[in-house]
Amino acid sequence: MADKVLKEKRRLFIRSVGTGTVNSLLDELLEKRVLNQEEMEKVRDENATVMDKARALIDAVIRKGPQACQIFIGHICEDDPHLAETLRLSSGPQSGNFLKTQDSQAVVHSSPALQAMPDDLAKLALSGPKVSLKLCSPEVVERIWKEKSAEMYPIMGKSMTRTRLALIICNTEFDNLSRRAGAEVDIASMKVLLEGLGYSVEVKENLTALDMTTELKAFAARPEHRSSDSTFLVFMSHGIREGICGKKFSEKVPDVLEVNTIFQIFNTRNCPNLRDKPKVIIIQACRGENQGVVWLKDSTGTSGNSSSLAPDDFEDDAIKKAHVEKDFIAFCSSTPDTVSWRSPTTGSVFIEKLIENLQEYAWSCDLEEIFRKVRLSFELPDARAQMPTAERVTLTRRFYLFPGH
């Protein structure tokens, strides 16, 4: 029976479901009259975190009986295939064939973000290779930890109360610049990857620079970071050297989110809940006509001043910066002043290669080693040459993702 299945999957559902799916389930259950308005608002408004909302929601549905549970399961399978795969669910009446078999060596995901894509892009993404993330066995985790624990960032396991968060900001539509065709594929693929790595993913689209700043500050203030071990920030937009273009950018309207603003919002002073935890910034910045430019680099003025300091002054300055700005790494789609390439049908080359390498090596390699492998995949230039680069790196330890752990 469906209620028995939900009881068995309750704990995994609470740990795995994202905000978007919780809200979608609430709407569906209200429409199907499984929940009334008061019950829906109680779940939504009286619980602070996504996990609390998920717990209240599934418990309320289980109490409603098998038919309510069947509607609940059917909506998950239709609206969030990734979650359905994670829970090993299938739609249809619940019987002995309800649970699906799953490869123990890899998890094959179908992105919930595909539901929001145009039909033609959704069909294209689904017809291509599925996103397959190699998992890390407990034995491998134990071996790596024994060998390298002194130089590793502490990682919280899924069995702990871990609330990893990630934020994707993608500008596709602009008032004065060309549409970034193919960006929908990047959003879907990156969301699936980060969810597979254990992050609850927020996606924000088509924002001005001010909107981006507001969203970043709100994300930095999230209490879940206190019980997390890391975060990912992904930016995809048109860009110039000075920063990320907002949707109103033009030659006359400097609607740009400066790079330094991102680091300031998430530094130790402004985001203490992420102190001593890896903060990974992924940047795919595009120019018009399916081309892009990477703009992030150290300020030449700062570099010049640093080189002229006396040793004692330099030491003081370094200590201060280590406390305020630490544990960051920004991985950009190309070196400064060179273009990045994006297909209008399959998405950005950089995002595609990054995802492929994380899928293949996150179970055994630390993040900086994976980024090196991404650069290696671009080593032989062709007509669409670009070279990804890591910038403003202040990671002091190795960061292992250990997917599945």
UniProtKB/Swiss-Prot annotation:
Top-rank EC class of the record's enzyme: hydrolase
| Domain CARD: residue ranges | 1-91
Biological process annotations from GO: apoptotic process; positive regulation of cytokine production; positive regulation of interleukin-1 beta production; protein autoprocessing; pyroptotic inflammatory response; regulation of apoptotic process; regulation of inflammatory response
Per UniProt, the keywords (alphabetical) are: Apoptosis, Cell membrane, Cytoplasm, Hydrolase, Membrane, Phosphoprotein, Protease, Thiol protease, Ubl conjugation, Zymogen
Instruction: Output the Pfam families linked to this UniProt entry.
Output: CARD (PF00619), Peptidase_C14 (PF00656)
Name the domain of life this protein comes from. Answer: Eukaryota
Q: Which residues does the Swiss-Prot or TrEMBL record annotate as the active site? A: H238, C286
Q: Which reaction does it catalyse?
A: Strict requirement for an Asp residue at position P1 and has a preferred cleavage sequence of Tyr-Val-Ala-Asp-|-
Which residues are assigned to the propeptide feature? 1-119, 299-317
Assembly, per entry: Heterotetramer that consists of two anti-parallel arranged heterodimers, each one formed by a 20 kDa (Caspase-1 subunit p20) and a 10 kDa (Caspase-1 subunit p10) subunit. May be a component of the inflammasome, a protein complex which also includes PYCARD, CARD8 and NLRP2 and whose function would be the activation of pro-inflammatory caspases. Component of the AIM2 PANoptosome complex, a multiprotein complex that drives inflammatory cell death (PANoptosis). Both the p10 and p20 subunits interact with MEFV. Interacts with CARD17P/INCA and CARD18.
Similarity-based family: Belongs to the peptidase C14A family.
Return the protein name. Answer: Caspase-1
Instruction: Identify the species of origin.
Output: Equus caballus
User: What gene, per UniProt, encodes this protein?
Assistant: CASP1
